[in-house]
Amino acid sequence: MLANGATRRGESGAVYSFIEPLGENARSRRNVWLIEEEGKSNVEFIAKGPSTEDDKSLGWPAFQHELKMQRLFNKDKMIRPMVDLIPSSATDEPMMVLKPFEQTLWEARNARPMTTSEIKWIMEGVLLGLQTVHQKGLVYTDLKMENVGITGFDNDKPNENIREIIVRIADCGSISEPGRREISSLTYRSPEVYFGKSWNQSTDIWSWGIILAQLLLAQVDFKSPGMYDAISTGKLEDKTQVARKAMATDFDLFSIPLYAEEEDSASLLPREQPGPDDIYGWAVDMSEKGISGEDLQFLVDVLNPRPDVRPTAAEIMSGGYLKVQLPPK
């Protein structure tokens, strides 16, 4: 097992010193490390190896898939780049050497309320990252604030120049072709996934819309949990059922044939249909807290429970909502 102070050589010839393991389970897992390139003062990177669940006997397929995706997108500016690969040895597993970022979007969201310009700038960066993935016919599948890297965000006060905020999509391990299996974290999961439908690039747009809704809500009610973030107790299946029921009510899935008229999904709908005052209650709540009509209309368009009419990344980019006044370069 790797220990603090260990050194390993990458394919580039660079030698890296392992400083400390990172992550919530750093002591037991030790597959993600902060490392430093020897001979270069304060040149730090992130080293990421196979997880403990990855099958070594099969050559770490999950790691190999993520490595393949990193190489596929390595020249795309909106994806966190891989700078080197540390090959496996008789005693150690392979590790990707990744460019670091200062914090995740989740950490930035919890630092302070963001300005409207900051929110739109960051969300445009995330959308550009998704568009990069979508243009290759692939789906990111696990978009959440924790998978967005942020550098240059001032945690104490609004950035005077939002160009200083650099946004990158991180963690390419979940990128895949369109499918039907269960994907995404509960908070960011789209209705089509919750109800067992096939999904494509539009599921990423739903997740993107949930992030936007959470950032806008934090602007006016900083301590409030975001949409579907309050579902945090109980077993996974119990939480899934609670979220599915809430979504069926919030977006009136009973009235949409895709969910109500097909047996596999209709059986997952709650027994009691919501009353007219319950439908789109989330939008009413956000309006009462001060979210503008323009923002709410945009969210209603993006968070359309019908994936076939949800806007694409390109359509959102050209629609003008994300446009902000930028300072001169």
Language-model features and meaning:
Residues 15-72:
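ATP-binding glycine-rich loop module of kinase domains
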Residues 81-94:
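Short beta-strand micro-motifs within the conserved protein kinase catalytic domain, predominantly
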Residues 100-110:
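Structural motif in protein kinase domains
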Residues 122-123:
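Activation segment signature within eukaryotic-like protein kinase domains
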Residues 134-161:
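Catalytic-loop of the protein kinase fold
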Residues 179-193:
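Conserved activation segment of eukaryotic-like protein kinases, specifically the C-terminal portion
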Residues 204:
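Conserved catalytic-loop aspartate of Hanks-type protein kinases
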Residues 248-298:
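C-terminal lobe substrate-recognition/regulatory segment of protein kinase catalytic domains
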